[in-house]
């Protein structure tokens, strides 16, 4: 909620910038998640704060761009293509938080193919003359593919709570780095 754009565009008191009654303009904000993923303690809090502002003005949210940056220290920053699960699970956690806590109805990645950086889902290797080369996939590509495959347009979220064996609510279990993050989905046909 940097710069109060939600309020500026959708609060009727913002006389110079209000768009809320403009025909054919959806009540929707798009945002990039750069520099909002670390430290982990702020990942959820920042998205909850965003959701609060969105709900206050009845505005939807699309997360319109994410890629690995230098501050993503948990996975070594953005340099060096990573074909392993480390980056894939890191990004899956970001997607989870954007959908669950910020209420993102759409989620986009930065780019599909790249060089020796973590922002490409596929690593390209080209010859010096740029006329030949090869490509290599990453686990990140498959993690994003699973979100695309199993969360379809029109899907809705259901609120679920986790409890321990004694029946006590487990607060914030999904932000525990050592804990298990679990999502379950039901298809339209009930399966």
Each predicted region: which residue ranges?
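Noncatalytic carbohydrate-binding groove/subsite architecture in carbohydrate-active enzymes
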Residues: 1-94, 101
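Generic detector of bulky aromatic hydrophobic side chains
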Residues: 24-25, 142, 191
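Aromatic/acidic polysaccharide-binding cleft in carbohydrate-active enzymes
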Residues: 60-171
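Carbohydrate-binding surface patches
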Residues: 165-191
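Short intrinsically disordered, low-complexity coil segments enriched in acidic
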Residues: 1-10, 151-152, 182, 189-191
